[in-house]
Amino acid sequence: MNKIRTIKLYKSYFKEFYIAQPKGVRDKINYSLYMVETMKIIPSKFFKNIVGSNGLYEIRSEYCGNIYRILCCMDNDFIVVLLQGFQKKSRKHLLKKFNWQNDLEKNISKRKRVCNMETGKKERILRCSTFEELLNEEYGCTGTPDREAFDSKAQAFCLAEQLKEERRKVGLTQEQLAKRIGTKKSYISRIENGHTDIQLSTLFRIFAGLGRRITFNVF
């Protein structure tokens, strides 16, 4: 994948949360993390600043109606450091209970130390310190069947969310967009639902109809 940012894991906090989740939840979390690493502009639905915090952000994932939130901070414009994960709670509750602001204040001036990730000592903790290493442990190295399947689905997920975001910005329904570019509404729906069997020529027509340029990895 063509990365814009690099995701790193701080200590074992996120890994303990991650490994406790069922496979479907882990996949959805990884789609969101893939989006953070590869998309220049990340939809606010998936990545936003936490108001009232000192440099904290949240990455969101959804699975079967449940919301999963990952607290993170930026080491610089190109490095995202994952701190902890939770099922949906209010921002106020998260900041009060876990008091990450104090921890960040101690580490924010020593960002290089923050990025020296420590491997957890508990059993069954993942041994990875970056998102790329996490993908290797979860799906195998680049080029293996499981990894190729994940990459294809993750790219389709990013494309689907990019299309939804751009379509809503210009105020078009799926039906209106389909009529504008001369295709079927069902085709727009398939893309927005993350299907991978999409013709490139149609993708370019769709985004041209939105007055947008599209950049993505071919899958």
Language-model features and meaning:
Residues 106, 117-158:
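N-terminal flexible/basic segments that precede or flank functional cores
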Residues 34, 38-44, 48-55, 142-170:
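Short basic alpha-helical hairpin corresponding to helix-turn-helix/winged-helix-like nucleic-acid-binding
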Residues 118-124, 161-176, 180, 205:
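Short basic helix-loop element that most often maps to the first helix and adjoining turn
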Residues 1-67, 76-80, 88-116:
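Basic, Lys/Arg-enriched alpha-helical interface segments
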Residues 201-216:
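DNA major-groove recognition helix of helix-turn-helix/homeodomain DNA-binding modules
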Residues 181-196:
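Recognition helix of helix-turn-helix/homeodomain-like DNA-binding domains
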